[in-house]
Structure formats: C-alpha cells, structure tokens
Amino acid sequence: MKRLNERSRMVTEGVARAPNRSMYYAIGYEEKDFVKPMVGVANGHSTITPCNSGLQKLADAAVSALEGAGAKAQMFGTPTVSDGIGMGTEGMKYSLVSREVIADSIETCVNGLWQDGVVVIGGCDKNMPGGMMALARTNVPGIYVYGGTIKPGHYKGKDLNIVSAFEAVGEFTSGRLSEEDLKGVEQHACPGSGSCGGMYTANTMSSAFEALGMSLPYSSTMANEDAEKVASTHDSAVVLVEAIKKNLRPRDIITKKSIENAVSVIMAVGGSTNAVLHFLAITSAAEIDWTIDDFERIRKRVPVIVDMKPSGTYLATDLHQAGGIPQVMKILLDDGLLHGDCMTITGKTVAEVLKDVPSVPRADQKVIRTLDNPLYKQGHLAILKGNISPEGCVTKITGLKNPSITGPARVFDSEDDAMAAIMAQKIKDGDIVVIRYEGPKGGPGMREMLAPTSALVGQGLGESVGLITDGRFSGGTWGMVVGHVAPEAYVGGTIALIHEGDSVTIDAHKLLIQLNVDDAEIAKRRAAWKQPKPRYTRGLLAKYAKLASTASKGAVTDLNLND
C-alpha cells in the first residue's frame, strides 16, 4: 500500500531529520502528525484587490477540512497583481509576469518542502494559469479552488461590472456621460469581494478548469460571498485527500483529451482571448503536444451557446443559477463535443460526473442555449495569420456586425501613446490602431489593452475601428481587436514595419491579418529596422524579457532554457 506521506517523509523520518522535526514542533506539530500526508494550501489571499480579498475564509476552510480528513495542512502565500488596478499603467507589465512568479512560488514550496499534495486557491486572472502550471509541473496530487465571482453592482437601475467603469471613461470624454454619472458608475461597479463578473479571464479559466477536471463541479461559477463557496472549498480539500490515497495526479487528469474538453467549454461560453495564451502555457507545463492551431480546430466545431458579457448579456452569477458549467458540458457531451472518458479529480469520469445533469437547459432561463439555437454557429476565438503575424494571433469575433475591416494604420509604439490619441479623439471611423512594442519581450510583459479598447467603445467606435497589438487584451475587451501578434515588434516581426497610413486588413472570416504593402517594400523596411534598446536592464521585467518565449508558444519562461 502506498504511504500517504511518501514525499514528506523525506524531511520527517530518521535520526538525521531531528532538526527538521524540531522546526515542525515549533509550529505546533505532534509526533503523530509525521505519518500524515502534508498538504500545501497555496493561499492567494490579498487585501490588494476584490478578486482576492475573500480568499482567507476559503483557505481556512481548506485547512479545517484537510485536518479533519487526516492530513496536515501547510498554508503558504502566493502573490497577486490586480489587473483592474494596474491596467493602463506601467504596473500592468507585471501582470503576465506574475503568472510565472505564481507558478514558480507554488513549485518552490511544494517541492522545496516535499509536500504530498496541494490545494491551490486563487482569484485574480493570473492566479488561475499560474496555479495550474504549478500543478502540472510538480505533478503532486492537487486541486484548484477558484475564489469565486463578484456579484453585479447597481446604479440607476442598471447592472454594472468593472468593464462598465472602463467604458464610462470613453463615454465621459466624448460627452456622452456626465461627471456625476461617471462617479456613480465608478463607485458602484464593484460591490464586494470576488473576481470580475463577466466571462472575463478569471471566470473563463475557472470554467475551463472545471471542464478540465481539476476543480469540483459547479465550483467555477459560485459567488465568493455566498456560503456555498466555503462549502465547496471544504469539499475540495476532502476530495484531494482521497486523490492522495488513490495517487491520482494532475497529469492523470490533464491530458490532450481533457485540454480539448476545456477549450471546447471556453468556446461554448464565449471566453477570454487570454485563455489561448494561458492554455499554451499550461500544456507546455504538462508537456502535452498542443499548438495555437489546435484552438482553431476546436473553434470550427464548437458553437457559442452561453450569452455572457463582455459581448453578450449575462454575468457568471446568472450562469450559475442557470445550471453552471455542468449544464454546458452536458449539452456538449450529448452531441459528441466532449470526451466523456476523461478522468476528473473526483475519481469519476466526465460522463459519470454529468450523469444526472439534464440534457436540456431549464426553460425559465435565457443564459444557456441549445445547440440548435446557438448565439454563434462556431466558436469566437479565431486564430488569424498573414504577413503581419505568420505565427498566428488571436481575435474575438462575437458581438461584431462586420468582422472585417480594411483601413489606414494609426501607429503607436506604446499603449500610453495610443491612449493619449484616443482620449484626444484623434482616432476616427475606419482607422486601424496599431499598438506595438508591447509584446512578451518588448513591453515587456504583454500589457492588456482594456483602457484603449474600452475608451474606443465608450466613444462609439467599437464597431468601426480596428486595433492590432503584440500585447494582450483583457477578458472584458470586445470589438474588432487582434492581439498576441507574433512575431512581436521587438524581435523584428512585421508589426514593427507598419508605417502610419499603411493599408491594413483584418478579416475574421478569412482568418487573415495583412499589411497591404508589396513584399519588396516590406523587405526594404526589414533591412533598415533596428532593434530598440531594452526598456529594462535589471530586475524582474528584465529577466522576463530575456526568458519569455513568443506569444504563440504561451510567453512562458522555461521553454528555451537549453537553447
């Protein structure tokens, strides 16, 4: 029989480990505890952001449940960066970098302390992939607990969320919103704890993790402030102890087939473009053969059947009341769009977990549709290629009346310069804004362009202006926007060669992104291009810029270490 403390006994057994045990006695351990599995609780609690401000009660619930199930809990902290607070500033360069820092920090504690399992608890966007990357890397029994979504805010009879505040900025600058109402939206958009409420990045990733089998059923759409979130966390910890007993590990669950399940659900719920980047990183950590083209393969066969913000109507709390991710998965499973034989952290297969879920969503809800009445017949996250991005880039094509545009390039070498032009109302109908040198290496850190895209939407230009960047977009972004352009400008990608006024085409139907300049002229510009000096030469951002892979491979830091 497998010993449940197979790893932790490396630091607790034998005469030579007397000093190690002394450290444990100092924090309240008793001799009987050294035969128990030692389970980490990676706690993302923080008073920095509402996304993480409600996590301590979940971490406490996990500790209590672990101890009650015969394990010994070891809580440690993981960092977080608030995208909503850093957005539009230099601080946003640390957001994607924090994904790597979170993965590294969890790996450090789990392996450095020989833990036998780990409960990862996170809230804000990069907590999600960072934690899952660590689970895939370490491959010790683990489970992901999402901190839960925020509830909607309210102002003058309207439901609000954080994107309402970003879009209000553009409405105010264009004279469409009063200063009083701007303040009203600002003060009521986020009413309490929990992650941003639409199908933005955090809720996209939590939904995907449930579909992946690494989180409990229904857990991904619960509100942080509801009692069921604490109860689900308790259950998650108990389930993890059972997984330790069964030696059920992340890589038994995270397989190519389960990744296909997760991406299918991302398409069905209308999830964030960031999911493409993050699942490239997760599959890299799990050593699964997965490329950016696999997203396009799945997009073509999975329709969008959930009507969610930012381009739709509803929030995660509405989805939860309508049946949650299990209802979405059951619809897909019945049509052969999911692999029912994939294992989950519960010890049951996907098909077994969904056995009692109705095949048809409730008639009294409007959030989840049936496959014969989808919002869109194909998925929404399209991979475009062309001379601007031969490696591929990502666009979200839901909510658009016309998913193609050809127009003059308005070129900016940073988000800040582009934002200044937008706020000064210098961008007009038909323009294509190009924001470059914001990629993994050039930014560094691939800032999210929620501020400029929301300002454009607020000014009424969301349908008539295109935007191309080697940076990223928030899960709250919608419009004719294309991100993750690779190769990026900093390494000499074609996006670096676009001149002000050049004709550029974005065509989501043809999956095309093209600089309409002849090859000879592009070659001439390429020969004259010189790489700019790095923006940082010391510290974390400099390290990330040095190590980061191309966006088409997830912008990870451990991919090319042997090159």
Swiss-Prot record:
**Catalysed transformations (reactions):** (2R)-2,3-dihydroxy-3-methylbutanoate = 3-methyl-2-oxobutanoate + H2O; (2R,3R)-2,3-dihydroxy-3-methylpentanoate = (S)-3-methyl-2-oxopentanoate + H2O
State where [2Fe-2S] cluster binds: C51, C124, C196
The family database entries (SUPFAM superfamilies) matched by this protein are listed as:
IlvD/EDD N-terminal domain-like, LeuD/IlvD-like
Q: Would you say which domain of life the source belongs to?
A: Bacteria
- Return the EC number: 4.2.1.9
Q: Which pathway is this protein assigned to?
A: Amino-acid biosynthesis; L-isoleucine biosynthesis; L-isoleucine from 2-oxobutanoate: step 3/4; Amino-acid biosynthesis; L-valine biosynthesis; L-valine from pyruvate: step 3/4
Question: Which GO molecular function annotation, any one, does this entry have?
Answer: 2 iron, 2 sulfur cluster binding
Q: Identify residues that carry N6-carboxylysine.
A: K126
Q: Name one GO biological process term.
A: L-valine biosynthetic process
> Which residues carry out catalysis?
S474
The cofactors required by this protein are:
[2Fe-2S] cluster; Mg(2+)
Q: How is the cofactor bound?
A: Binds 1 [2Fe-2S] cluster per subunit. This cluster acts as a Lewis acid cofactor.
| Enzyme type, top EC level | lyase
Q: Which UniProt keywords are present, listed alphabetically?
A: 2Fe-2S, Amino-acid biosynthesis, Branched-chain amino acid biosynthesis, Iron, Iron-sulfur, Lyase, Magnesium, Metal-binding
Which residues does Mg(2+) bind? D83, D125, K126, E448
The entry's family comment says:
Belongs to the IlvD/Edd family.
Biological function: Functions in the biosynthesis of branched-chain amino acids. Catalyzes the dehydration of (2R,3R)-2,3-dihydroxy-3-methylpentanoate (2,3-dihydroxy-3-methylvalerate) into 2-oxo-3-methylpentanoate (2-oxo-3-methylvalerate) and of (2R)-2,3-dihydroxy-3-methylbutanoate (2,3-dihydroxyisovalerate) into 2-oxo-3-methylbutanoate (2-oxoisovalerate), the penultimate precursor to L-isoleucine and L-valine, respectively.
Q: How does it assemble?
A: Homodimer.
Its recorded name reads Dihydroxy-acid dehydratase
Q: What is the lineage of its organism?
A: Bacteria, Pseudomonadati, Pseudomonadota, Betaproteobacteria, Burkholderiales
